[in-house]
From Swiss-Prot:
<dbReference type="Pfam" id="PF01926">
    <property type="entry name" value="MMR_HSR1"/>
</dbReference>
<keyword id="KW-0342">GTP-binding</keyword>
<keyword id="KW-0717">Septation</keyword>
<comment type="function">
    <text>Necessary for normal cell division and for the maintenance of normal septation.</text>
</comment>
<keyword id="KW-0131">Cell cycle</keyword>
<feature type="binding site">
    <location>
        <begin position="178"/>
        <end position="180"/>
    </location>
    <ligand>
        <name>GTP</name>
    </ligand>
</feature>
<dbReference type="GO" id="GO:0005829">
    <property type="term" value="C:cytosol"/>
</dbReference>
<dbReference type="InterPro" id="IPR027417">
    <property type="entry name" value="P-loop_NTPase"/>
</dbReference>
<feature type="binding site">
    <location>
        <begin position="145"/>
        <end position="148"/>
    </location>
    <ligand>
        <name>GTP</name>
    </ligand>
</feature>
<keyword id="KW-0547">Nucleotide-binding</keyword>
<feature type="binding site">
    <location>
        <begin position="60"/>
        <end position="64"/>
    </location>
    <ligand>
        <name>GTP</name>
    </ligand>
</feature>
<feature type="binding site">
    <location>
        <position position="40"/>
    </location>
    <ligand>
        <name>Mg(2+)</name>
    </ligand>
</feature>
<dbReference type="InterPro" id="IPR006073">
    <property type="entry name" value="GTP-bd"/>
</dbReference>
<feature type="binding site">
    <location>
        <position position="62"/>
    </location>
    <ligand>
        <name>Mg(2+)</name>
    </ligand>
</feature>
<feature type="domain" description="EngB-type G">
    <location>
        <begin position="25"/>
        <end position="199"/>
    </location>
</feature>
<feature type="binding site">
    <location>
        <begin position="78"/>
        <end position="81"/>
    </location>
    <ligand>
        <name>GTP</name>
    </ligand>
</feature>
<comment type="similarity">
    <text>Belongs to the TRAFAC class TrmE-Era-EngA-EngB-Septin-like GTPase superfamily. EngB GTPase family.</text>
</comment>
Length: 205
């Protein structure tokens, strides 16, 4: 299979606790990022379904781990956004722990899709996610979101800066300029996910 039809992606199930997850087969791609980086919008743009991944108008309100099936055995997982400053500290800590626990303990994860606002990349909690990827030896695909908000030369400068910092930490990563609103980077995202599917699912069956 050279390409997947992401338009046929469907919602599987939501979980509030890691221990409740009862899906064990197949592989997963984890979408991770701060609560205002546009994770749900990216999934909706990828699948061309406006309401597949529901999102709150208030950042940080989505607290569930949401599973979506692209094809049998290949899933996208939308994790709770971290770092929402207006949430109480205890609530933020619980959300962050939920994300970290899933990323550290879930063996089915084969790729981290780390979404960062291109204007404010590599914040503290992003770097924690990167450290988990280093420990687990998992590839990272960085989506520098909202790239339409800045000029092209600034986009390049930001991407170069992120590349230089990641290049000393990671053996395998990719950076894509992305905008759900302007439909920028969607085809590149599909190609990267197709590659991960082929590498970890088809070739290892």
């Amino acid at each position: 299979m050279n390409s997947l039809d992401y338009n046929k992606t469907n919602f599987l199930k939501s979980y509030s606790k890691i221990t409740d997850i009862d899906i064990q087969n197949g592989i997963e791609i984890a979408f991770i990022g701060y609560s205002n980086t546009g994770k749900s919008s990216a999934i909706n743009a990828l699948t061309n379904q406006k309401k597949l991944a529901r999102f709150s108008k208030t950042p940080g309100r989505t607290q569930l781990i949401n599973f979506f099936e692209v094809v049998s055995g290949f899933r996208i997982v939308d994790l709770p956004g971290y770092g929402y400053s207006q949430a109480p500290l205890l609530v933020r800590s619980k959300w962050q722990k939920k994300v970290y626990d899933y990323l550290e303990k879930r063996e089915q994860i084969k790729l981290f899709v780390l979404l960062m606002d291109i204007r404010y990349p590599l914040k503290k909690l992003d770097q924690k996610i990167i450290s988990i990827a280093v420990q687990k030896k998992i590839s990272i695909l960085v989506l520098l979101t909202k790239c339409d908000k800045i000029k092209i030369n600034h986009q390049k400068n930001q991407a170069d800066m992120v590349f230089k910092k990641l290049n000393v930490l990671l053996d395998s990563f990719e950076i894509i300029l992305f905008s759900s609103y302007k439909k920028i980077g969607i085809e590149k995202l599909k190609l990267s996910l197709n590659s991960s599917y082929k590498k970890h699912f088809i070739l290892n069956r």
